């Protein structure tokens, strides 16, 4: 009588492995349904993780979509250098789009304020690019834990022909089943990192040794204090107030955007373990340094309804 064959032991995935598997599944499902997909690449830590997951999802082949960066011309210089270096290292197709009409009018965060700048140089610019290249699926790195309006958005988010988001038209997503049916002119924003947290992102960056912009690590940087925010003076376009002089302070950034609209935090965290330790102890959102989130009640939801990332 033959001996009974023991059933194979069940492999228990770690928390990060489950998140990784979900994100890869989302990428593959969306690409299978898409006619012309693209990945929105904003150069920050979430975009770096998103790109890493996309490369894993379609390895050993090339990415089946290009990267699209909406360049407001006001990003930190280190961000642009990092973007160009990574695209070259990985052999990626990178499309950079700037709203030329807004550029010609001199629209900027200092001269016109955060709300006008964000609308013209980010939202309108993104809509222009999506229309020009006729993308029907755009991957983004937004996470639900970042902000209230993002918390209620679906992983597969339907946008109308004007790229607007209607929270009342969201679709159910039971058992990781996603509905990609759409009418002519409609499109989708797809968020593979929806269920990740800021801590998950940092733990995964450490685990996978993912390159990120050096601005996330503490260093001596020239900053001025404006409205309770430490703003880094990244170039000579930033106007100093009478008697104001940039001070060298040890700071880093929890989130990155246009430099006049992004506040730094004082911190000694110069390594990934130190950043993870700070994240564990944090009692405020990483987006506390984003000036655009303070453009009135419901600012982010209103921006998203207008077509923002």
UniProtKB/Swiss-Prot annotation:
Gene Ontology molecular function: any one? sulfate adenylyltransferase (ATP) activity
Output the Pfam families linked to this UniProt entry: PAPS_reduct (PF01507)
Q: In which pathway does it act?
A: Sulfur metabolism; hydrogen sulfide biosynthesis; sulfite from sulfate: step 1/3
Q: Which UniProt keywords apply?
A: ATP-binding, Nucleotide-binding, Nucleotidyltransferase, Transferase
Q: Which reaction does it catalyse?
A: sulfate + ATP + H(+) = adenosine 5'-phosphosulfate + diphosphate
Give me any GO biological process, just one: sulfate assimilation
Q: What is its EC number?
A: 2.7.7.4
| SUPFAM superfamilies per record | Adenine nucleotide alpha hydrolases-like
Enzyme class at the top of the EC tree? transferase
Its family remark reads: Belongs to the PAPS reductase family. CysD subfamily.
Q: Subunit info?
A: Heterodimer composed of CysD, the smaller subunit, and CysN.
Job description of the protein: With CysN forms the ATP sulfurylase (ATPS) that catalyzes the adenylation of sulfate producing adenosine 5'-phosphosulfate (APS) and diphosphate, the first enzymatic step in sulfur assimilation pathway. APS synthesis involves the formation of a high-energy phosphoric-sulfuric acid anhydride bond driven by GTP hydrolysis by CysN coupled to ATP hydrolysis by CysD.
This one is known as Sulfate adenylyltransferase subunit 2
Which source organism does the UniProt entry give? Methylorubrum populi (strain ATCC BAA-705 / NCIMB 13946 / BJ001)
Gene name of the encoded protein:
cysD
